[in-house]
Amino acid sequence: MIQFVAFGGALLWGKLAKWMGAKQSVILSLVVWSGVVIYAYFGLYGETRVTQFFILGIFIALVMGGSQAISRSLFAQMIPKGKEAEYYSFYEISERGTSWIGPLVFGLANQMFGSLRPALLSLIFFFVIGLILLPFVKVDKAIADVKAYDANRA
């Protein structure tokens, strides 16, 4: 189920990116991710817990497929032609080099509070950091600089 919904999410976020721009779509995805975490924290109670879990899974899949695709697409626009391997290598190294931070924060929150719910809520920290930093990224300037760099090399 998740893979099929994620595929649809990628298509949906692609349309959103065309309509509102890739950077704004990534920002929106961070807001939706925060909402998903808040829903996971507050929403999974009672007799309808299984249904709520499936609803949560659908939202996770929708935003996951799209946010990853749009983020990589946005990053690709800021790479000079012929430098893709270098830039994506750096992207992967930085991703792998920091991938332990989320589980560490999650585990520490779980250990401190003795519950997975506060640990889930701790994940919002990363989305908020993205929401704070992303507006400072000058995407239009980066894309223009790449075009100028490529034109000078031709």
Features from the language model and the residues they span:
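C-terminal ends and interior cores of transmembrane alpha-helices
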Residues: V31-E47
